[in-house]
């Protein structure tokens, strides 16, 4: 879709990104150490969310007054710590992941952040875990950052369990720009492209796609 608003954006140069980071909340020692330990893992560290995404997740949880949250795809725990810190005092976060090696790091940082009692981590296919949850609209916030081909199925399972006004966030919706490249026919790209096309037409939610990091879509249940 073309139009005069199409060019209403500011390109993020390295200097401007540094400025942006300097005017956002800085990660505390727990998150700084977690990010450093994750970076030391090598190329796999790219699976960690960006610092500004973590700040946004904490902000969202607080704005929503979230008590119950679900995360699909925990990795080393940066996003989980960010979400859990934004929950109300008696709030709880359910994390779903398959990898015990990466989540062992997450567990250490949950404890260090004083959040171990508020976060439940289940090592199992996320779709199986989600289907065990009551099919009642009790969840306030969801963050999906798992296998891309599973996003649509996760969404359909979680939406009935989300309260009206609750929010589902989808990470990597720009997929490095591949979603706008017709020649990219990889399974992940096709799945994300189809999800993006579907969500923008789904009248069950209000939607915004943000150019944050690798793209973050927020869907608010009507």
Feature map (PLM): residue ranges:
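A short alpha-helical cap/connector motif
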Residues: 1-141, 148-169, 173-222
């Amino acid at each position: 879709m073309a139009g005069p608003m199409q060019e209403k954006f500011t390109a993020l140069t390295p200097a401007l990104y540094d400025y942006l980071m300097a005017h956002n909340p800085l990660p505390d020692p727990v998150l700084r150490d977690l990010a450093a330990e994750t970076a030391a893992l090598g190329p796999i560290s790219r699976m960690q969310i960006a610092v500004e995404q973590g700040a946004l997740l904490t902000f969202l949880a607080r704005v929503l007054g979230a008590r119950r949250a679900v995360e699909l795809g925990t990795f080393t725990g940066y996003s989980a710590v960010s979400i859990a810190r934004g929950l109300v005092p008696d709030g709880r976060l359910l994390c779903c992941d398959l990898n015990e090696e990466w989540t062992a790091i997450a567990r250490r940082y949950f404890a260090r952040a004083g959040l171990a009692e508020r976060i439940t981590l289940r090592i199992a296919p996320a779709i199986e875990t989600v289907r065990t949850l009551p099919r009642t609209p009790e969840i306030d916030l969801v963050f999906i950052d798992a296998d891309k081909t599973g996003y649509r199925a996760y969404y359909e399972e979680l939406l009935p369990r989300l309260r009206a006004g609750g929010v589902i966030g989808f990470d990597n919706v720009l997929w490095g720009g591949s979603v706008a490249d017709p020649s990219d026919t990889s399974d992940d790209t096709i799945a994300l492209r189809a999800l993006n096309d579907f969500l923008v037409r789904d009248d069950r939610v209000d939607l915004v796609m943000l150019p944050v990091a690798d793209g973050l879509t927020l869907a608010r249940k009507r």
